[in-house]
Design a protein with these regions (language model features):
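Residues within the DNA-recognition helix of helix-turn-helix
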Residues: 39-42
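Basic, Lys/Arg-enriched C-terminal extension of HTH/homeodomain DNA-binding domains
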Residues: 45-67
Length: 67
C-alpha cells in the first residue's frame, strides 16, 4: 500500500504527536524550523484541512500514523 506521506512528513508528524515543538523537531531531524513548517503545510494542503490538529486526526483515521 502506498503512503500519502513522504518519509520525512511521516517522521515530522510522528514527532508532532509526541508533543515535540517545531524547534525540537528541527533539531531532532537536523533541518531548519522553516523546513519543518513547510512539510506540515504541505500535509495540511494534501489533506484539505485547516490545522495541524486536523491533519493529525485525519492521518490517524487514515492509519498513516499511529499514536
Amino acid at each position: 500500500m502506498h503512503s500519502l506521506l513522504t518519509k520525512r512528513e511521516k517522521e515530522i508528524f510522528t514527532l508532532l504527536i509526541q508533543s515535540y515543538t517545531t524547534k525540537q523537531i528541527a533539531k531532532q531531524l537536523y533541518i531548519s524550523e522553516k523546513t519543518v513548517r513547510n512539510h506540515i503545510s504541505n500535509v495540511i494542503q494534501k489533506l484539505g484541512v485547516e490545522s495541524r490538529i486536523q491533519a493529525v486526526l485525519e492521518l490517524i483515521k487514515m492509519k498513516e500514523i499511529d499514536l
